[in-house]
C-alpha cells in the first residue's frame, strides 16, 4: 500500500488538465502510441468539442521512479465546471492529494478556487503545477505569487510544465511520488468503499467507479449500498489503464470499477458508501448528499411522432446521468413533451445538445425556471417550477425564491460594468477585495438564482472579454414578489409562453415578448391581438393588422351604395373568420420569442 498514490487534477476550464492527463498516460505507457488520442479521458464527443470534462474518469498508471521503486498511480480526472461541482467533491474524497494546474498566462480563477478549497477540506496535500510555460504571455513568477496570496498555499516549489509539448512531465511524476501521502486503510477491517461515479455500459450494465477505504472487494461478494440498503452481488472487478482490465479483487487504498447486475444508474448514488452484507462497517463515509436539480425547462419534439424517440433518448441518457430528472407533460401549443430538471445551465445545454446530436431529434426548449416555494393561504407549502402549476394569485400568501452566493473574479478594468450587471440582476454586494497586490478583484454577491440561470454567465464573459470567472452555491430561500406572466393570443392563453418573473420585470418582459411575437406571427385575414397579463390585468398589447383585399377595385363610376355594399360584405366575412379562425403560430415563433435578449 505504501507504493500507491491516489490523486486528482484540479483546474479551471481550459487550463489544460485533460492534456496533462494525456501526457501522464503517455509517460507511463498506459496506451500504445497508436491508441493515443487527445483528451483520452474525455470520452464523449461533446466533452472534446467544448473542451470540458463532464463525467469524472479514472486511470491506473504504473511508474518506475528515480529511486528504483515501482509505484501505482491512480489519477482521477474531475470536471471543472460549476454545474458539476458535487462530482468534483466526491472524486476528491477518494484521493489523498491533488495536482493544482494553473495556466501560467492567465493565473488563478474562481472555479479553481472553489475546487482547491474542497481539496483542502479533504485534507489533501497539494502540488502546484504551472502549465503553458512555453507561451509568450506566460509569467510563472507572478502566478506563483498569486497562488500564495489567493489560495494561501506555498508555491515556491511549483512544477513548471507545458502539457502540450511534454516539458516537465517527468518532474510532475517525481513530485507525486515524493510529496503525496500513501493511502491509509486496513485490509482486514470490514469493507468500506466510496462510490465515486457510475455510468452505463451496453455489455456490463451499470459500471461503478469505487475507491476502497478499508477491507477488500472480491468477485462474487454480496454488497450493500448504505444510503438505501439495496443489496447486490459483484460480477466483475477491474481497473482502467485507461482500457478496462479485469483483476478479480480490489483492496484498501485501490481505485477501480465493479459491476453488479444493476439495471439503472439511479440505483447507485455518487458519494454513497458500499459495504459487505455479511460483515458491514459501523458507519458510512462522511460527505454523502442527494443531488437535486436546480434549473427546469420543458423539452418538446418538433414532430409529435418523435415523442416516443425522445422518451427513449432521455431514458438512455438517464442511465448515464442520474442527476437530471424528467416527467411527461402536455402543452396546447407544443403538444407532448417532457419537463426536465438539471444541475445548471451548462448541464441543460449539454443534455439538449446530446439529444439533438446523438439521437438526431429536433427539439424546442421553453424558458428555464427555478424552484419557487409557495405558501398558500390555507398553510400548504408547494414547490413550483412549472408556470402552469402556479396557484391563483388570490390563494397565495407568500412566494419565496432561491438565492445564491456568487464568487466572481474579475480584472480591475471590467469591475464597474460587472458591478452594474450584478445590481441590474437584483444582486446584493457582500464583499469586494483585491487579491494581494494584483489588479484582480474578488467579489462576493448574493443574487436570485432566477436571474443567474438565463444568460448571466454569458453576459459576464462578454463584458469581461472572457477574463471573469464565476462560482456559486445556493444559500437560502427569501420572500420575494413573484408573478406569473401569461400571454394571450386573440384572448386564448398560450401555455408554452407563460413564465414566472419578478414583479419589477413583468412589464418589460411582457412588452419584449409581445413585440417579438408581432414580428414572428404571420398576418392573417383578420386582426390579431397579442396580450401579456399578470393575474387578470393586461400589462402589454400588440396588434397585428389584417391583410386587406381591395374589393372595390373593379368598380368604376356608378352608385356609391354598390361600393358600400361590397365593403360591408367584406367586413362581415372577416368578422366570421375571426370568430372561427385559429391563429396558427409557427414553431420557430416560440423558439425565437423565448430567447432572452440582452
Swiss-Prot record:
UniProt-annotated location(s): Cell membrane
EC numbers: 3.6.5.n1
Membrane topology category: Peripheral membrane protein
Pfam families, A to Z: EFG_C, EFG_III, GTP_EFTU, GTP_EFTU_D2, LepA_C
Catalysed reactions, semicolon-separated: GTP + H2O = GDP + phosphate + H(+)
Protein family: Belongs to the TRAFAC class translation factor GTPase superfamily. Classic translation factor GTPase family. LepA subfamily.
Entry binding sites for GTP: 14-19, 131-134
GO cellular component terms, A-Z: plasma membrane
Record bears the keyword Cell membrane: yes
GO annotation terms (biological process): positive regulation of translation
Main location per the UniProt record: membrane
GO terms of molecular function: GTP binding; GTPase activity; guanosine tetraphosphate binding; ribosome binding; translation elongation factor activity
Domain tr-type G, residue spans: 2-184
Function: Required for accurate and efficient protein synthesis under certain stress conditions. May act as a fidelity factor of the translation reaction, by catalyzing a one-codon backward translocation of tRNAs on improperly translocated ribosomes. Back-translocation proceeds from a post-translocation (POST) complex to a pre-translocation (PRE) complex, thus giving elongation factor G a second chance to translocate the tRNAs correctly. Binds to ribosomes in a GTP-dependent manner.
HAMAP family the UniProt entry points to: LepA (MF_00071)
Name recorded for this polypeptide: Elongation factor 4
PROSITE patterns tied to this protein: G_TR_1 (PS00301), G_TR_2 (PS51722)
Keywords: Cell membrane, GTP-binding, Hydrolase, Membrane, Nucleotide-binding, Protein biosynthesis
InterPro entries, alphabetized: EF-4, EFG_II, EFG_III/V, EFG_V-like, EFTu-like_2, G_TR_CS, LepA_C_sf, LepA_CTD
